[in-house]
């Protein structure tokens, strides 16, 4: 009897260990937006604690049409939204034009830490060209921190990707962001690693300037760092960035310009919205053939009413080295976390969807 009790105890411990180690996986029905909503709601409830075990929401290829719903929230921590493919898994909403706004339109609103998105498209289908002077339609509003996006496409026009946390940290790898005006905007530190940036037409006929980024860096040291990104341009001329307010920071390193003639001569917009204190820099810009087309000097005088702030925006190789990922996020190392989660996501895909 004693041996039986010991055996039962061992079995219970083993079962408990297996139960603890088992991945938390929520499957979404293909193309079913309501199924996606319920999956996110379930994950939010069970991962309310910041130390919660990571949960993976598996989203098969299909269109998940949220209709006019806005600000679908992620409030649970350590939640992964894993699509089947970047081009095939599409989460879309279409806010009415009268709801236009940076706080009132997002497809997904993240309020948690440790959120991971991979292999999907977020599309905000607000009718930008019918919206008048402003057509703000956010795809991913990040009020949380330590978000990682891997192979995520964001389709919109104005304010497409909004980092809405002054202390937020974000890392994007091999992702694609489309837009026209300030379509990468906000606060905190965000590192764009070999991403594709697509500037769309500012107006239907292509007239009017395009601005990629509008940082409002306040309480962090780095702002927006673009490393090894490619910029594709659709007809309208564009600037890298303009200052929003506070102390904007932005740097483009090792950038490939597919249509360099569409970049304004100033490269950065000198007209600040609410500040002239812009730390905007550039290093080793190339054309589509890999030729270095960086000017030797580019002094931009940032201006706001009677204030002026001249800045040499071209930096040296030694200055560029300070923007290494390990320096920017020394206690996070998101590239290592991404590699680990991506491997797990691929394993789960094979289990649930078969060989790819």
Named regions from a protein language model:
Residues 1-7:
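Bacterial N-terminal signal peptides that target proteins for export
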Residues 17-21:
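Sec/Tat signal peptide C-region and signal peptidase I cleavage site
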Residues 8-15:
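Bacterial N-terminal signal peptides
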Residues 22-29, 33-356:
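Sequence-level preference for short, compositionally simple segments enriched
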